[in-house]
């Protein structure tokens, strides 16, 4: 089974796991849109990442973190996040891929990461997958770690 783990949002990430092994991990592809140079998810690039890794012989699952609005988050920020989330859902629908949603508390509890900082998920992934530590060397790579753990959670609990 090939599992795509997705931490949605402009600073999110996409991971690809097969047989509990991390095949690849990407920062969320973005592009600049409009006169105000606002970033948004590059749907075409996300589509290519997924399509190029689909093997018709294997079962596919796309697992997306299901996040709600956070207190103190502005209206524009919530709209942008929702737009990114919608792009990912649309891509999966267009490609006829099964999409599953997991709340952050579910996958974080599975890995004992409740009430920890963002750095903890990166540390956890490096412990489990030391061979990819070079891909997670920056602090901002915690989003890549989240995407990996989202896919791994699905693998551990659903497969």
Residues covered by each model-derived region:
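Phosphate- and other anionic-substrate recognition elements at nucleic-acid/protein interfaces
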Residues: 1-159
């Amino acid at each position: 089974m090939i599992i795509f783990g997705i931490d949605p949002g402009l600073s999110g990430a996409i991971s690809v796991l097969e047989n509990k092994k991390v095949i690849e991990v990407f920062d969320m592809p973005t592009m600049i849109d409009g006169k105000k140079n606002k970033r948004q998810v590059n749907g075409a690039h996300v589509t290519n990442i997924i399509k190029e890794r689909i093997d018709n012989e294997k079962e596919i699952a796309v697992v997306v973190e299901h996040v709600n609005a956070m207190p103190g988050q502005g209206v524009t920020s919530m709209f942008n996040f929702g737009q990114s989330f919608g792009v990912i859902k649309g891509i999966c629908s267009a490609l006829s891929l099964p999409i599953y949603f997991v709340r952050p508390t579910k996958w974080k509890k599975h890995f004992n990461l409740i009430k920890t900082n963002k750095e903890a998920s990166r540390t956890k992934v490096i412990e489990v997958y030391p061979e990819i530590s070079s891909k997670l060397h920056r602090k901002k790579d915690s989003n890549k770690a989240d995407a990996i753990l989202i896919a791994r959670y699905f693998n551990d609990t659903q497969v």
